[in-house]
């Protein structure tokens, strides 16, 4: 199953990009990052089997185990792609939110795009390591 991060804005080079790269390289699943301009630009076409997850302040706050369980369920259901959208500075409007299969939040705080991307990459690594039985995650 493809893990596809689609983010508004360019990350460039720097410590945030290095952190994203570090976690993406650890993930044992196919992973792709698509960067779009802050405004405009088209989302890649969405196949019917694609799960759409929007990072949104109004989203559900999931612990790492619950997030891993969702990924595992989608994988086991034969989903080909889980697409994670990181919006522009103003986030998503209500019409866009209705298109999502899951609205996902990293708590109630607002996070800069670069940190949100790094946090998502880390959570994807953590979730896939949980599903693989790797000892990286310690619940408790």
UniProtKB/Swiss-Prot annotation:
Keywords: Cytoplasm, Methyltransferase, rRNA processing, S-adenosyl-L-methionine, Transferase
Catalysed reactions, as listed in the record: pseudouridine(1915) in 23S rRNA + S-adenosyl-L-methionine = N(3)-methylpseudouridine(1915) in 23S rRNA + S-adenosyl-L-homocysteine + H(+)
One GO CC term, this protein: cytoplasm
Family statement drawn from the similarity comment of this UniProt entry: Belongs to the RNA methyltransferase RlmH family.
EC top class named in words: transferase
KW rRNA processing (keyword) present: yes
Subunit and interaction comment: Homodimer.
HAMAP family the record matches: 23SrRNA_methyltr_H (MF_00658)
SUPFAM superfamilies tied to this protein: alpha/beta knot
Function according to Swiss-Prot or TrEMBL: Specifically methylates the pseudouridine at position 1915 (m3Psi1915) in 23S rRNA.
Gene, per the UniProt record: rlmH
Residues the entry annotates as binding S-adenosyl-L-methionine: 55, 87
Protein name: Ribosomal RNA large subunit methyltransferase H
InterPro entries assigned to the protein according to its UniProt record, in alphabetical order: Alpha/beta_knot_MTases, RlmH-like, tRNA_m1G_MTases_N
Organism: Rhizorhabdus wittichii (strain DSM 6014 / CCUG 31198 / JCM 15750 / NBRC 105917 / EY 4224 / RW1)
Keyword Lipoprotein recorded: no
Listed EC numbers: 2.1.1.177
């Amino acid at each position: 199953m493809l893990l596809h991060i689609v983010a508004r804005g360019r990350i460039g080079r720097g410590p945030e990009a290095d952190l994203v790269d570090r976690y993406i390289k650890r993930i044992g699943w196919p992973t792709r990052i698509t960067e779009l301009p802050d405004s405009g630009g088209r989302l890649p076409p969405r196949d019917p089997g694609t799960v759409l997850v929007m990072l949104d302040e109004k989203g559900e706050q999931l612990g790492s185990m619950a997030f891993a369980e969702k990924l595992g369920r989608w994988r086991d259901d034969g989903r080909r792609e889980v697409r994670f959208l990181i919006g522009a500075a103003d986030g998503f409007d209500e019409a866009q939110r209705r298109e999502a299969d899951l609205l996902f939040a990293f708590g109630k705080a607002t996070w800069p795009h670069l940190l949100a991307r790094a946090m998502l990459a880390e959570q994807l690594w953590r979730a896939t390591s949980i599903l693989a039985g790797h000892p990286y995650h310690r619940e408790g």
